[in-house]
Design a protein with these regions (language model features):
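ATP-dependent helicase/translocase motor core
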Residues: 1-74, 81-93, 155, 159, ...
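SF2 helicase/translocase NTPase motor core
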Residues: 36-47, 80-84, 88-179
Length: 180
């Protein structure tokens, strides 16, 4: 028979495959998150909603493919926790991580990599460094987070997370641009 009855769900899946098959061909094992690292067993991963988990995996894929990604969700959707899951993944791969944030957000980021009672993910033992946006324009001294700016090995970071990155949309001095 030339006609065969198919469930609507099958037609839907076939349409999705036809639309996204080229994308699926581009996805290789090299850019998919390594499940053997156990990052899905982390405290931060298990605090995420499904949409945040999807975002974290997509970010990792984009970072591995393009060496960069922008997470631009609306206010209140948990960008910080999504970023923390990505940080956990890279730290699981023994990559050093730098978080650049405005001074007003210091306490948020310091809490999540510290062994303090109000850190809900202290068991994940995150070890990222924190610098302020304004530290990029300095070449001497010590950051308020204790890092020596004149001896900092900027090239050692396997991941740089920039919180409130829209603050960089206007030109700055050349010293900070060289580090970026």
């Amino acid at each position: 028979a030339m006609y065969q009855e198919n469930a609507p769900e099958l037609i839907y899946y076939m349409a999705l495959y036809r639309i996204f098959s080229e994308f699926l061909d581009d996805v290789s094992e090299d850019v998919l998150p390594n499940e053997g690292l156990g990052f899905r067993d982390s405290l931060i991963w298990n605090k995420l909603y499904d949409f945040q988990k999807d975002a974290a995996l997509a970010i990792i894929n984009k970072l591995e493919t393009y060496n960069g990604c922008i997470l631009a969700d609306s206010v209140g959707l948990g960008k910080t926790f999504t970023a923390l899951a990505v940080i956990k993944y890279y730290e699981s791969r023994n990559k050093d991580v730098l978080v650049l944030c405005p001074k007003k957000l210091r306490d948020n980021w310091i809490t999540y990599n510290s062994n303090v009672v109000n850190n809900p993910i202290a068991g994940d033992r995150l070890q990222y460094d924190v610098l302020y946006h304004t530290d990029l324009s300095r070449t001497r001294g010590t950051s308020e987070t204790g890092l020596p700016l004149d001896r900092l090995n900027w090239g050692a970071y396997g991941l740089v997370v920039i919180d409130e990155s829209h603050n960089f949309r206007n030109g700055g001095d050349s010293a900070s641009e060289d580090r970026m």
